Amino acid sequence: KIIYNINSGSNTIQWDLPSYTNSGTLSIKGSIDIYGISLESKTGVTIDNVPMRGAAGTFFSSINSEMMKYFYKNLNTQLIILQFGGNAMYSGITKKQIEYYAQNIGKQIKYFQNILPDVPILFIGPSDMSENVQGKMQTRHFLVEMINALRDTVINNGAAFWNTFEAMGGENSMVAWANMNPPLASPDYIHFSKRGADRIGEMLYESINN
């Protein structure tokens, strides 16, 4: 049993637990805000994920930067990976809206660079996405323009860009992935299947190593 008295302000508590530990209990007396619990080993790579389902990725710059800097430094962050753009491809989007969205993504990159100026940023672009055009599934209108706008913004802001769309095979590749046996994409022609997501992960890994 370990007892800590927490002072006002930001605090980090670290426990070094035996490798055979499989459960624990945290009890709190009084009022306290807990922003996160990280379970890590002394070796290997630790990934901290922010799974914002349906998000466009333009909200980071509204988060208190000093608080984020404190978190990232305590986590010893060595790489920031952003993957956004697909949820911004709503029906009826215009080129002007794509331009505005890309500029907003640029602000997010600058936000992270200001917090961790020495940490590289990798932006993963949208995959191919299909829509029904006169009874035929085709790459969504303006998707290529979205990808190009994001690529230019990311690179111009000093971050790395990985083109998922091109890695898949380019235009109408989502249809091909969905029609594979076993399928690498879902029947909605937007999302990957588990097997397809694994394959994309492998392709990204291979790109980084090469």
PLM features: residue spans?
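Loop/turn elements at helix/coil->beta-strand transitions in domains of secreted/extracellular proteins
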Residues: 45-46, 75-80, 116-121, 156-160
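Conserved SGNH/GDSL esterase-like catalytic core that processes O-acyl groups on lipids
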Residues: 1-104, 191
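Short, flexible coil/linker segments at or flanking structured domains
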Residues: 3, 35, 56, 68, ...
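Structured segments of extracytoplasmic/periplasmic soluble domains
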Residues: 40, 70-74, 83, 108-115, ...
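Conserved, well-ordered alpha-helix/loop/beta-strand core segments that scaffold catalytic motifs
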Residues: 79-85, 102-113, 120-129, 148
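Structural signal for conserved beta-strand scaffold positions within catalytic alpha/beta enzyme cores
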Residues: 49-51, 123, 163
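Catalytic His-Asp segment of secreted/periplasmic serine-dependent ester chemistry enzymes
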Residues: 65, 127-210
